[in-house]
Every structure is written in C-alpha cells, then in structure tokens.
Amino acid sequence: MAKLHEVYKDKVVAELQEKFGFSSVMQVPLIEKITLNMGVGEALADKKILDNAVADLAAISGQKPLITKARKSVAGFKVREGYPIGCKVTLRGERMWDFFERLVSIAIPRIRDFRGVSAKSFDGRGNYSMGVREQIIFPEIDYDKVDRVRGMDITITTSAKSDEEGRALLEAFNFPFKK
C-alpha cells in the first residue's frame, strides 16, 4: 500500500473530520482519480511524435494511455475529425496513490524555478488542475532518450464539495501551494 494512502487513513481523515465538523468518516473528501493528459498537436505532421508521447505517459503512469482523437474538424489547425491529437491516462486505486506520492515528493520539487503551485486552479467543486511544462521532472523518464520536451495536464479529482475542502485535503498531503 502506498505511504500516502496510509497517511490518509491514519491522519488526514481524522484531521479533516475535526476541521470541517463531519459527523461521518464517509463525508471526509478523498482523491477519487488523477487524470494525465498530453495534447500533441504536432502529431498531425509526424506519427512518431504521438508514439513517443504515448511511451512517455506509459512510463510515468505505469499503464497504457488512451489515444485521444479530434472531436471536430478545425480548418485553421488543419485538423480533421477523428485525427489522433493526444493521449490520456486515468489513474485510480493503488496506481493513483503511487503516482500522487511521486508527484508530491519527487516530481514537483524538480521543477525549475519552483515557488509553489497556484492555489487558484480549483474548479469550484474541489478538483485541482495543474500543468507541467516538462515531462523530464519525472524520474521514470530517461533524459538522454527524450526526443523533445513535452508538457502535460494533471487533474486531481476529489470527492470534496468545495474548493476549501479540496485545498485542505491536498494541504494535508503537503501539496506545495504558494503562500
């Protein structure tokens, strides 16, 4: 079992239950899933770029990514409906906890000129989204084998009812918000 999952069960639940006055343990927010999305617009010109992005995302997440396709045609971007333009992975359960632990303890501190993540990126329902400009912050990516630096979106979906609850949940895991 991931260390952060045990921390959640042992400390975070009691802490949040006391802070928000929840009558039941089941009311305490938890992380439901983490979604990693990599948009690869350059894949229109070269299919190998998408294959490399899929390989990177598979190495980071530990599971095979789903290739996302364009929903509609956009002439300005030279995109037709059904063209592969990215990839995504939805992590749940133990893989999610393992990834979250690596994200908080290893990957985020490796970001260049890091001063904390924005606390304004909540969606109003307690879910948090952040962007990463370089996939090389993850230890699974071999720097020498990277063909080009790609970014990705990371969305942490929680069962929190408000941004305040979501932020308290992530802060309990020492998520590095800007002060």
UniProtKB/Swiss-Prot annotation:
The keyword Ribosomal protein applies. Keywords: Ribonucleoprotein, Ribosomal protein, RNA-binding, rRNA-binding, tRNA-binding. The keyword Ribonucleoprotein applies. One of its GO terms (molecular function) is structural constituent of ribosome. InterPro entries: Ribosomal_uL5 (IPR002132), Ribosomal_uL5_bac-type (IPR020930), Ribosomal_uL5_C (IPR031309), Ribosomal_uL5_CS (IPR020929), Ribosomal_uL5_dom_sf (IPR022803), Ribosomal_uL5_N (IPR031310). GO terms for biological process: translation. Pfam families: Ribosomal_L5 (PF00281), Ribosomal_L5_C (PF00673). GO terms for cellular component: ribonucleoprotein complex; ribosome. Belongs to the universal ribosomal protein uL5 family. NCBIfam families: PRK00010.1. Part of the 50S ribosomal subunit; part of the 5S rRNA/L5/L18/L25 subcomplex. Contacts the 5S rRNA and the P site tRNA. Forms a bridge to the 30S subunit in the 70S ribosome. This is one of the proteins that bind and probably mediate the attachment of the 5S RNA into the large ribosomal subunit, where it forms part of the central protuberance. In the 70S ribosome it contacts protein S13 of the 30S subunit (bridge B1b), connecting the 2 subunits; this bridge is implicated in subunit movement. Contacts the P site tRNA; the 5S rRNA and some of its associated proteins might help stabilize positioning of ribosome-bound tRNAs. This is Large ribosomal subunit protein uL5. It comes from Pseudoalteromonas translucida (strain TAC 125). The lineage of its organism: Bacteria, Pseudomonadati, Pseudomonadota, Gammaproteobacteria, Alteromonadales.
